[in-house]
């Protein structure tokens, strides 16, 4: 039987807020007695856009914009009820998207 594991994926445009929230999660989980793996930085997704500056002509005048989406991964091994309760009440900064999944283990 595989031990239960919680996988947390964090996404955001601001890498500082992302690292801050990842460290908050790791500190909270360690205080409850569960084992933590991470935060692991995943590849950054870069979306680039090329836009004409002029509304009509001057095709050579263009502007380039990009959006960088940073990702982090945190795995929690052998979580307890106290761990899950503390994660539910955790206050994280805005602009960070959190995806929580349970992996492995059967009841």
Swiss-Prot record:
<protein>
    <recommendedName>
        <fullName>Small ribosomal subunit protein uS10</fullName>
    </recommendedName>
</protein>
<dbReference type="InterPro" id="IPR027486">
    <property type="entry name" value="Ribosomal_uS10_dom"/>
</dbReference>
<keyword id="KW-0687">Ribonucleoprotein</keyword>
<dbReference type="GO" id="GO:1990904">
    <property type="term" value="C:ribonucleoprotein complex"/>
</dbReference>
<dbReference type="GO" id="GO:0005840">
    <property type="term" value="C:ribosome"/>
</dbReference>
<comment type="subunit">
    <text>Part of the 30S ribosomal subunit.</text>
</comment>
<dbReference type="GO" id="GO:0006412">
    <property type="term" value="P:translation"/>
</dbReference>
<keyword id="KW-0689">Ribosomal protein</keyword>
<dbReference type="GO" id="GO:0000049">
    <property type="term" value="F:tRNA binding"/>
</dbReference>
<dbReference type="Pfam" id="PF00338">
    <property type="entry name" value="Ribosomal_S10"/>
</dbReference>
<dbReference type="InterPro" id="IPR018268">
    <property type="entry name" value="Ribosomal_uS10_CS"/>
</dbReference>
<dbReference type="GO" id="GO:0003735">
    <property type="term" value="F:structural constituent of ribosome"/>
</dbReference>
<dbReference type="InterPro" id="IPR036838">
    <property type="entry name" value="Ribosomal_uS10_dom_sf"/>
</dbReference>
<dbReference type="InterPro" id="IPR001848">
    <property type="entry name" value="Ribosomal_uS10"/>
</dbReference>
<comment type="similarity">
    <text>Belongs to the universal ribosomal protein uS10 family.</text>
</comment>
<comment type="function">
    <text>Involved in the binding of tRNA to the ribosomes.</text>
</comment>
